[in-house]
Structures are given as structure tokens and as C-alpha cells.
Amino acid sequence: GLGDVYKRQRAKSYLSEALLHSFAESKKNHVDFYRRYLTRVSLDLGEDLYKNVTTDKRVENFKETHDAHLVATYFQFGRYLLICSSQPGGQPANLQGIWNDKLFPSWDSKYTCNINLEMNYWPSEVTNLSELNEPFFRLIKEVSESGKETAKVMYGANGWVLHHNTDIWRITGALDKAPSGMWPSGGAWLCRHLWEHYLYTGDIEFLRSIYPILKESGLFFDEIMVKEPVHNWLIVCPSNSPENVHSGSNGKATTAAGCTMDNQLIFDLWTAIILASQILNTCLLYTSDAADDSLRV
């Protein structure tokens, strides 16, 4: 079919372009490309005492040697993986990495938003790979749009919602089983990464561009949270502590109300909204509501 013809043509174009350059030139371009990222940060944990030992043996012997230089190497390996799998213009780093070789990979190679996707990007700002957030931030922008329909249909609410998974089509609804799927706070966690990018860069124009995403996520929680009857706290219900069970439930109960994780994520989100609105001098009425709500979480 036409699709196969296109794939062959595209593959040939890549090969033709590659063959225009010698091996030495291609290797130099490759090394230079990675070096400009990797050399921004170094981690010195002392002398390399095992430099004549192969890496597989160093890993095998780590319990006995406590090989500090291997730890520093592993630190850079983590940065290398993000450099490989999150180049601007592409897709974000997923559960399996860019070189997955299976038609049906584990967990569908999706984006799991109840910690995995966030963990992939924890090193981005603190290890000076800030621009590699671009695919991730584009995903957040896209789920903030698709999540508006989910918020309206599932919860009758304004704003946007994301549950524990999304994919290349930017799904946002609850899926899989209750211990993981019935968790509507993925959007709040992703918003934290937008706010942290501003904290690291001080980029006012970036903050201005993502403020509506923060605000609409906060609006969703403002509309769906309910009062806890004893203390009059605002809580998310139903929800869960992702992939966790309640103590005392014999490992059976998962769906809950007012989970600590939700409380912290939403308090953090509203705090970011309040601070951002003060910096941008905007939405003061909404900010007042958010400040009141945050005190009741």
C-alpha cells in the first residue's frame, strides 16, 4: 500500500543522507551532539578505584565494593537516557524508551502519570537539561485540551482532568482497574513541572503561556472537591492512593476519599496558581477563591 511505499522512501532518504558522510565524520557529529548536553554537569564522588574492571563486573560487585565512581557513571547514564528519548520536536520519554522493539510492549509503553512520567523528568531541570522538557510540556498542553471533554463528560465540571494514563492520542479518562485508574489528580502533578520550569528559569513569558493550564486544572478541583463531614475539609472523592491499599482492609480496599497524595498535589497546585497570578498581576478574584480553598484542603 501507499503507507509501505512511504515508509520505504523515508527509510531510503535517511540512509542516503547518512551515506553522504564518512564514518569518522558521523561519529564526531554524534559525540559532539551528546557532549554539549553531558558536559554541562559533572558529579565527582572520588577516585575511580576500579577503572580496569568491566562495567558488568562493577555492577555485580557493587554490594561489596560500594563503587562510588559507578554511581557517578549511573548518574550520567540517567541523563543520557533522557537525552536519547526526549529531543525537542519528538514525543516525551515513555515507559519503555524510544527503542522499544515489541508490537505489544509492557503497559502498552504508555505515559503513566501517577509517578512514572514525572520521574522521567525529575532530572531535567536540576541536571541542566531544561530544553529536553519541550516534548513533555507539549504533552501537558495537549492533555489540558483533551482533558476538558473528560472533565465535562465524567464529572460535569469545567477545567481539565487527567487520570493515571495517557498515550500518543492524549487520552485523559479513567482506565484499567480501580487501584490505579480511579485517580483524577494526574493533571495537578503535571502542572508542578510547568511551575518548576518557571522557578528554575525565571521565564515570565513561559509562565504567562502556561498560567491558563494551571488555572484550568485548579478550576476542575474547585468544582469537584467535596466537604469532609467531620472537619469540613475539601477533599477529592472518589480517588485512591495510586496502586495502594488501605491498611486494615486485608489488602482489598483501594477507592478512598481525601488521600494524602491528592491533598498535597492540589495544595501545591493552588499555591502555584496564587504565586503565578501575583507575579503576572492577573485573575485576582480567582486567586482569592484558590487561596480560600487551599486553606481547607
Predicted stretch roles:
Residues 1-9, 286-293:
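Conserved small/polar residues in nucleotide/adenosyl-binding loops
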Residues 4-8, 94-110, 158-207, 222-284:
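The feature captures the catalytic groove of carbohydrate-active enzymes
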Residues 4-111, 130-134, 140-150, 281:
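Acidic/polar, glycine-enriched structural segments that form the non-catalytic walls/loops
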Residues 61-65, 122, 128-185, 189, ...:
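Active-site lining segments of carbohydrate-active enzymes
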Residues 71-85, 187-196, 212, 216-221:
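Extended, hydrophobic/aromatic-rich amphipathic alpha-helical segments that build helical scaffolds
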Residues 76-79, 89, 211, 215-219, ...:
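Acidic, mature catalytic/reactive cores of soluble proteins
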Residues 81-84, 117-130, 188, 194-203:
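Alpha-helical support elements that line or immediately flank enzyme active sites
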Residues 82-86, 138-151, 213-228, 288:
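Long, well-ordered core segments of solenoidal/helical folds
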